[in-house]
């Protein structure tokens, strides 16, 4: 499958029975063949010993408006691919990969249909990999565990330089010299665990998905019912990093607003007292968490056209 402008190609294969995918940009590899699949509790992984049962292609080209965003209206234009698979060995479980190719990236997700037996699905982790074609320069936010404030410095390190035990937050920005800038992230998370990334093994350019564990059952990440769909796994792609900022790819992958009437929503700039703490210049009161400071901030916002406090 290719993007509407033909620059991006996504290929899904079952070489040797293992479900895999690869991505190229302008004819150059971005992601080498990378493993797909789900690791299930008390069951073999879902994604090995698979064969393609059917393939369906389509396209989307629509526009919509949003209360706030980078551009308005937003155009949602992509080519779509749905690959239905089934195991070649018993119990012949089924899996569908739904994918989209945009001019600014690709996305895919897992769909697990009813299997005809128990409809509960218990996911330990995903087998999803991102095998970068080069030892790219990355700019990760390294987290100490799955419960953090997400406040730390972004680093500059090659893929092979990421410690195998480091937990990488998304989005992850990477520069593949001579090929593209990419950002790995996710979209449409609903009734599913958040995804992080970890370095596969030392000296490898492969990153693997890590799902946040459940608090009540730490050995599991997702407990839900079939039919089930995962969030989108997103690879944003551009020749320049600024194009990633301009992209509407993630919002296009998210579902439409559940709020039918958005006319009452008035977006605007907002001040927040934590931004400046208790600091205020040339005032006749003691700055701090007090009424005088809040009134000072409100007056500042009024004078400078800042709508909210």
For every predicted segment, state its role:
Residues 1-257:
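N-terminal accessory beta-strand-rich subdomains and adjacent acidic, glycine-rich linkers
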Residues 225-308:
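An acidic-aromatic substrate-binding cleft motif
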